[in-house]
Design a protein with these regions (language model features):
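Intrinsic disorder/low-complexity segments in short proteins, especially the signal peptide
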Residues: 7, 21-25
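N-terminal carbohydrate-binding/catalytic regions of secreted carbohydrate-active enzymes
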Residues: 68-72
Length: 190
């Protein structure tokens, strides 16, 4: 092993110490929060298997799923959420007020299942345009793809999966703020 000695050794140790204790450049403005360290997976659709990614991710949930969706019409995703709840996973779904009636019956059935709560944003001119969910405070799914059959089958979309407790926590903070709006409408019996 190479061991610096004498003046060179002192200089090396001083430089190493300075490197270790000197803070890196500080981000300012919108980049002020610390960067999130994450395992990142990017998917682009339409393509083979793109529409089934959400179902596979939801199938891996063990404790919690918090989903904020502008659109939730994909019966595969709705069924995956129902199966997760049947396994004991607590499921919360937050939808935009513009959500159409194409899946109203399926969403009502989901909302009445044990371990599931569904809320809809009160009507306003502002959209809740998220297409994201967190699973077990460890994984965040986000991107341009709505939770719809067409998003996975026909539309050009991206889907980003971050395996990061920090990313999931940042989303969960936003989700809790949206979920707590006093004028939200509850769907189902809860």
């Amino acid at each position: 092993m190479l061991r610096p000695s004498g003046a060179a050794g002192v200089g090396f140790i001083a430089a190493l110490f300075a490197f270790l204790v000197t803070p890196g450049p500080q981000a300012a403005g919108v980049l002020a929060p610390e960067p999130i360290i994450a395992g990142v997976r990017l998917f682009y659709g339409p393509g083979d298997g793109f529409g089934a990614i959400d179902e596979r991710l939801i199938a891996g949930a063990r404790r919690h799923i918090d989903l904020a969706g502008f659109v939730l019409t994909d019966h595969g995703v709705i069924d995956a959420l129902s199966r997760a709840a049947a396994r004991g996973v607590v499921v919360r779904v937050y939808l935009d007020s513009e959500e159409n009636d194409r899946s109203a019956r399926a969403i009502a059935t989901l909302a009445n299942a044990p371990k599931v709560e569904v809320r809809r944003k009160a009507p306003s001119r502002d959209l809740m345009h998220l297409k994201s969910y967190q699973i077990d405070e460890r994984l965040l799914r986000t991107g341009s793809a709505n939770f719809s059959f067409s998003a996975g089958s026909y539309q050009d979309n991206d889907l980003i999966v971050l395996e990061s407790p920090q990313a999931a926590a940042r989303f969960l903070d936003t989700f809790e703020r949206l979920w707590a709006r006093p004028d939200n409408q509850r769907i189902g019996v809860r």
